[in-house]
Swiss-Prot record:
This is Dihydroorotase. Keywords: Hydrolase, Metal-binding, Pyrimidine biosynthesis, Zinc. Pathway: Pyrimidine metabolism; UMP biosynthesis via de novo pathway; (S)-dihydroorotate from bicarbonate: step 3/3. It comes from the Bacteria. Zn(2+) 1 binds at residues 58, 60, 150, 303. Its EC number is 3.5.2.3.
Length: 427
């Protein structure tokens, strides 16, 4: 039986246009106004916005090894609640997906428990120790989406160069958390006026930018697609912009929290605002927004990083880095940037859906049209609501945005035409 999404509105040339959508066998088979019902199951949308599903290439699902923070099941429920139909979990788990055995075990857990499409990363080095490279070819054959040691930077240039050479031969991407360990200095936040005022050790911006500068030259030499995770500083933006102008195959992402906040959000020793990379200066903050708009940064990824409440309820120097983002990304960005006229709705959808898929050559996140995969998110753009921890489907709610009032509530998420999330039905 087909499914008919009736009475929704889709984006056409930045205008919302009424269209019904018929789905059959996981694909869109018909679009138009007032389609015949035939024998379709009908879902009434009452004028709500219908978007292609979002693609998040940077999440932490914590399984295996960190199930008290998040599981594949809870993390993908949260993703679906946020409108994401494809997510890519990072390999900083225990064990690390650094072998065929480990990635196959992960694949089985995904098959059993995931509520949305999950494309797992494999690590670059064994156990993410930065020393011995994994078997790139074997891991690709067993479903690795790309290769990253996210959570730490690859410290040795020769290791990164060889990794890029192997990835390039397989037409795979190297995805990098960029951080020179010799420049961290035990920091817990950005090194700047706020860290000095609070007497909390800081991490300088150059810690990130130095490693990006090294890596773009290695990527050029290896002719490898090199993707930079969670860009946070104006220096990093400058390096990436120059590399793109030079024709180097570099792409980059930015998180919602780095687009929304800067270091001045931290007014006391509060680990809910501890993230890596840290919130930096207002100058950095504005550079990130400008870089996204001019294409230096390609898209938005959440870096959804759940932690248990007791882990975050510590001083910043002791608590883990990270905040959750799967369930809050769209409403926060829509409220801040689209509602006030800085961006169009189409731009936001490009950053969350279309461009992540394009950068990694995925068939997901593409525009809604006949023949496309029925990954669909339905959103009430006019509904205002408060972000509350008790409403989260994630096992964790470590975010500074609790209590914010936002617009853009996800009502329904479909993955290949099947309901992954429907408001009020969380079973």
């Amino acid at each position: 039986m087909s499914t008919l999404l009736r009475g929704g509105k889709v984006l056409v040339n930045d205008e919302l246009v009424s269209k019904d959508i018929r789905i059959e066998d996981g694909k869109i088979v018909e679009m138009g106004e007032k389609l015949n019902v035939y024998n379709s199951e009908i879902i009434e949308l009452d004028g709500k916005f219908v978007s292609q599903g979002f693609v998040d290439v940077h999440v932490h699902l914590r399984e295996p090894g960190g199930e008290h923070k998040e599981t594949i099941e809870s993390g993908t429920r949260a993703a679906a609640r946020g409108g994401f139909t494809t997510v890519c979990p990072m390999p900083n788990t225990r064990p690390v997906p650094d072998s065929v055995e480990h990635i196959e075990a992960l694949n089985q857990s995904i098959k059993q428990h995931a509520k949305v499409r999950v494309l797992p990363y494999a690590s670059i080095t064994e156990r993410q120790l930065g020393k011995d490279l994994v078997d790139f070819k074997a891991l690709k054959e067993h479903g690795a989406f790309a290769f990253t040691d996210d959570g730490v930077g690859v410290q040795t240039a020769s290791i990164m160069y060889e990794a890029m050479q192997q990835a390039a031969q397989l037409n795979m991407a190297i995805v990098a958390h960029c951080e020179d360990n010799s420049l961290i200095y035990g920091g817990a936040m950005h090194e700047g006026k706020v860290s000095k005022a609070l007497n909390i050790p800081g991490i300088p911006s150059i810690c990130e930018a130095v490693q990006i500068a090294r890596d773009v030259l290695l990527a050029e030499a290896a002719d490898c697609h090199y993707h930079v995770c969670h860009v946070s500083s104006k220096e990093s933006v400058r390096v990436i912009r120059d590399a793109k102008r030079a024709g180097i195959k570099v792409t980059a992402e930015v998180t919602p929290h780095h687009l929304l906040l800067n270091e001045t959000a931290i007014t006391e020793d509060d680990a809910i605002l501890k993230m890596n990379p840290p919130l930096r200066s207002e100058e950095d903050h504005q550079a990130l927004i400008e870089a996204l708009l001019d294409g230096t940064i390609d898209f938005i990824a959440t870096d959804h990083a759940p932690h248990a409440a007791d882990e975050k309820n510590q001083p910043m120097t002791k608590a883990p880095f990270g905040i959750v983002g799967s369930e809050t990304a769209f409403p926060l960005l829509y409220t801040r940037f689209v509602k006030n006229g800085d961006w169009t709705l189409g731009q936001l959808i490009d950053y969350l859906a279309l461009k992540p898929g394009q950068v990694f050559g995925l068939p997901y996140g593409k525009s809604l049209e006949v023949g496309s995969i029925a990954d669909i998110t339905v959103i009430d753009l006019d509904e205002k609501y408060e972000i509350k921890s008790e409403d989260f489907l994630s096992k964790s709610s470590n975010t500074p945005f609790i209590g914010e009032h936002v617009y853009g509530n996800v009502k329904l998420t479909l993955v290949e035409g099947q309901i992954a999330y429907q408001e009020g039905q969380h079973a």
